[in-house]
Amino acid sequence: MKTGALTTFLALCLPVTVFATTLRLSNEVDLLVLDGKKVSSSLLRGAESIELENGPHQLVFRVEKTIRLSGNEERLYISPPLVISFDTQLISQVNFQLPRLENEREASHFNAAPRLALLDGDAMPIPVKLDILAITSTAKVVDYEIETERYNKSAKRASLPQFATMMADDSTLLSDVSELDTVPPQSQTLTEQRLKYWFRLADPQTRHHFLQWAEKQPPS
């Protein structure tokens, strides 16, 4: 897609619906899947928040933080993938609250029994269900979207069955009229559909930065 066409395409992605919940992102949280859809890391890189509709949501993510080792050394701690489900029906803002993770002992405890909180805009805890996403694939590159679908079909603690089949058929991605102004034509690629979805969820500043980046890209 040529840069000019990409910019025009993205400009048409601005939401026509009003989102009611702001999910504040943390630089210590690597968001992998949102509501059954793989997160577009390139679009959300550096974003401070994304906008969600009211209702049930599910995040798959990893906690990534530098921890101290003995002898004043440090290493990057990466948690196992976690699944958290919650409802934003009456909530306007969601914030991550991570436990203390400063050393190997605290990291080991977190691996064995993860715990964290989601807080609303008044710093009040939001009811959540938290679980570890057990990976069944032996591939070098994990498809977290597929693993999340499998998890949601297994009636686990944080499963949300309504997100289990959303990605089973890529041709249905974003075909609901509540997510698109019009149903995408058959010629529209899956990549474009995914890009449109994540562009609409990104906060205005992230959209602006992405459009600036797109304008600088050479035509393909």
From Swiss-Prot:
Q: Decide whether keyword Signal is in the record.
A: yes
Which key words tag this protein in UniProt? Signal
The leader peptide range reads: 1-20
Q: Which domain of life is it from?
A: Bacteria
Q: Which one Pfam family would you cite for this protein?
A: DUF2057
Q: Which PANTHER family match?
A: UPF0319 PROTEIN YCCT (PTHR38108:SF1)
Report the sequence similarity comment from the record.
Answer: Belongs to the UPF0319 family.
Which named protein is this? UPF0319 protein YccT
Organism per entry: Salmonella dublin (strain CT_02021853)
